[in-house]
């Protein structure tokens, strides 16, 4: 199934994705699915079904988070990315039935986006890597 009324904005930190989603949803009286909009579902997730997304929720000792090997961390990021996409698509299935334009700040992988959306409904925004790295922790979020 391809979404006809959903527009995806993907990319790096500081590229302007959140700003673009807000502005487009205001201009077109649409729905803004802002960064991490799927977080509203996390508190009710089963840790067996969503081990990546519930890892930090259920973490007893943050030292365990920091002590992971680079390979373990990478595997967690990859798992969490897949799980986020599942939740986002569940939310978008419901929202898309409202008939409004939906603008999504997302990290859904591009191979998934190519299956669920037309090319002209996907925008990839990239910030200068130096800005993304040097200013990342200046963000309020």
Model-derived regions, located:
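Short beta-strand-centered segment that lines the nucleotide-binding/catalytic pocket of NTP-utilizing
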Residues: 28-46
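ATP-binding Walker
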Residues: 12-15
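Walker A/P-loop
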Residues: 18
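ATP-dependent small-molecule kinase phosphotransfer cores
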Residues: 41-101, 108
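Phosphate-binding P-loop
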Residues: 1-4
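Conserved phosphate-donor/acceptor-positioning beta-strand/loop module used by diverse small-molecule
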Residues: 116-141
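Conserved nucleotide-binding/hydrolysis micro-motifs of P-loop NTPases
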Residues: 38-39, 108-110, 126-133
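Hydrophobic anchor at the beta1->P-loop junction of P-loop NTPases
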Residues: 9
């Amino acid at each position: 199934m391809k979404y006809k009324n959903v527009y995806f904005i993907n990319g790096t930190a500081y590229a302007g994705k959140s700003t673009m989603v807000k502005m487009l949803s205001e201009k077109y009286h649409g729905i803004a699915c802002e960064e991490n909009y799927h977080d509203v579902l996390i508190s009710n997730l089963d840790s067996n079904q969503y081990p990546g997304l519930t890892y930090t929720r259920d973490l007893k000792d943050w030292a365990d988070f920091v002590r992971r090997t680079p390979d373990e961390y990478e595997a967690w990021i990859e798992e969490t990315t897949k799980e986020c996409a599942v939740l986002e698509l569940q939310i978008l299935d419901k929202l898309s039935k409202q008939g409004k334009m939906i603008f999504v700040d997302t990290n859904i992988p591009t191979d998934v986006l190519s299956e669920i959306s037309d090319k002209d409904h996907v925008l990839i925004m990239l910030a200068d890597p130096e800005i993304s790295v040097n200013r990342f922790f200046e963000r309020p979020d």
